[in-house]
Each structure stands twice: as C-alpha cells, then as structure tokens.
C-alpha cells in the first residue's frame, strides 16, 4: 500500500472570504497564474537553440551576444507574432504593438539614444529571419527613424552632412520599395541621372548637395506613386516596416524558394529590430560578407568581400564590385585580425562553415549575422571531411552536413578541353559558382521562363540579379552578371542551386 501523501490527507474546509477585499485578492491571485504569451525578446534574452521562435537570424544574434561578440543591441519579434498577424487578417494585435514599443524603450536605454530624437537619434534596421536560411527572399529596411529634422541632427552630430543625406535617401528608397511597393527602378534611374549630371560613375562620388537633391526627388517619387507624403513619425515607420517584413513571407519569390527547398509555409518569419551601425560614414568604414571557408571549393581559407564607405545591401546586391577580404588586412589590420579571431570562434562553436555579415564603423568591427553557409556539393564534401580530420565533428555528424539533394550536382558539367582550345574567349569574370553551361542568352527572368517553356536552354545575363529573379535563375543553365562578386546575391543563390555562375 502506498503511503498517504500530505495532499491525500483530509484537510479542514477553509471558509471562503466573501468580502470585497477578499474578492480582489482572489482575482489578483488568479491573474498572476495566467502567463501571457511573450512576442518580443532582447538579444540578451535568447540563445541559439530558439530558432523556431526567434528565426535563424534572431537566434544567432542572441547566441553571438551571449558569447560576448560585438553585436549591436536589438530585439526580435517572434515567428508566433507573424503567425498571429496572418490569423488576425494581416494586422498586428494591439498587445503585440504595445510590446514592440516597450522593447523600443528598452533598446533606447541600452543604446543611450532615442528614436526620433533630434539631438541624439536612434536609427534601426528591420530585417526578416526565418528559421531556415532564405538568402535574399524576404525584405530588409535600413536606417529607419529618419525624417527631415532627424537628418539635420545627424548631420550636425557627425559633422558629415553627406553621410546623413546618403543614409536618408537610402531609407526612403528601401521603405518605398518594401513597404509601399514603389518599383526601385524609379529611384535607381534618379541616381543614374544625378551621376550623369555630375559626370561621375560611382554613388560615392556624389556630394552632400547631390544627396539632398536626391532626398527631395525620392520623396516626390513616393508621393507621386502613393498619393501621400512620406511618413515622418518613426513609430509609424517601424510598425509599417514590421508588417511589410511579415508580408514578405508570402511574396512570390519566398513562396517559390520554400517550395524548392521544402520549407513549410506555416513556419512564418521573425523580425529583428537592431540599432544601426554605419559603414557609409567615410573611408574608415565599410561593410562586407565573409565565409570561414571557400563556399565554392571548400578550401580552408578565410574567404569574403567588402566595400569601403558602403552599407550591407551594396555588397549582396552587387551594385559595386567589392574588394577581397584579403585587402582588409592591408587597410585595417587590427579589424582584420579581430574578425579572423571571431570567425574562427564561430566555426568552432557551430561546428560548421559560417557565412557572416559585418560592418565597420569608424574603425570598429560589428557582427550583424552568422549562419551556416550555402556551399556547392564539392565544397560540402570537402568541408565535412576536413572538419572530421580537425576533430571538430564525428563521421556521423559529417554525413549530416551533406544534403542528399546535392549529390546529383556533385559532378558539375565541364567543357571538352579540345572545344575550349578552339573557342574564342569573349569575356572572363569571377568563378562565383563552378561548372559549365551552354544556352541562348536572355536578359531577364521572364524571358528565361518563356524560352525554357518552349524547350530552349538559356543563360541568364543580368547587370546584377535580385531576389525577384529567383525563378529565372533556377531554370537557367548558367548565370552571368556584369556587376557583383563572389558574395553577391547571384553567387550565393547559384551555389545553393548548383548552377554555374560567373560574376564580373
């Protein structure tokens, strides 16, 4: 017979307190037993095991924060908030909005800056982050919090009006594209016309007055398409941006990518809101993407690219051809050494090749992302074997690092050497993704889809690819981009798909 526990013994019946104060005490006790769902987490409150809730980006930012790495302060709005957004008819519930603003206040306290303040303004990025990596498929907005008054404050604070107005025009362009769906081509055309007018080739050659003019042109473009002025209230900018990132989970390119990669539509995306650090303040600033090993070959060598005086989207978009990460060692040796040390720590911590985003502001390094890097089939095999030889993983773990679907692409097509000798070389470029391809040249993704449907083989040729090109890229034999580099959008996506790609 089991011994009688204390809870099993007969207890004397307690008399209920039916007074008003007793009722209040009962209500408060019951209320305290109800645990409300938490939809927002500071980076310092999460960790790398929380991918389902915080998404890959949010979980890894939290993990890097816990490891003491130089990560700008921020918070993550969970995937459950995204699910709730769709359940509520594509609206953000009042309690979730209130929680987001509560965490904005916490972020302001951590940063020592205030959103919308003219004297010491906080600017933030708003970025997507699904639990599975979907490079470039969803949306990002940088420099949020700017308006006509704040930009003047930043110009005064930094003594750098060119930087302030460059940052402002970038924000208007990204907000208009992502939130209001104003085609980005209108803004790019305005920039090209300004460069022609000034007789320069690069955005970086435009001065402060040029940037001011672009800001006014961009605001006029926004109003012309939307029918109302560009929003000036930072909290309105923030909530509209969070909604836009949630919506981007269901944009056509994201849906296509999920189908191709077996990612459930029910997962949703998290949203990271992070204090901005700036790579576009001058020549002691920059931004880049790097891998702990070569993602094309698997070679154990630090691999990546960066741009001086730029923001992160400039690198992945291929707007300018970046410099090799090796050149950073010459330009900023202390930053390079610190970055190399962090990269080594991250690979050992995650026990896999890492794909990292970083920004340098006034000679100081900041980590903005890390994730397991996309790689070719050959690279996957070499990296898995090397990690075993280095004692980082077991043979059983190595098998799991190679995606079975990649094995078909393991033997990339190669040209017949005799044919190569006879062929006339028209152009050479960077080997962004290995292989060989033959086909008819097409200049846009829509034409690629039409021609492939007619049974033709095509080579997709673009100035630079964008996420909107994903379907055309997937069905092409090969990809050629005029601008970009080894870490551009075209390169990263092509390697993941096992498609030959060269990028100038």
Task: Set out the residue ranges of the language-model regions.
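N-terminal amphipathic/hydrophobic targeting modules at extreme N-termini
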Residues: 1-7, 12, 18, 22-24
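Intrinsically disordered, glycine-rich low-complexity segments
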Residues: 16-17, 31
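Nucleotide/phosphate-binding sheet-loop regions of phosphoryl- and nucleotidyl-transfer enzymes
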Residues: 29-423, 450, 456-459, 466-471, ...
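Extended, non-globular alpha-helical segments
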Residues: 431-468
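Structural motif
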Residues: 461-463, 481-482, 504
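Acidic, glycine-rich catalytic loops of TOPRIM or P-loop NTPase phosphate-binding modules used
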Residues: 498-504
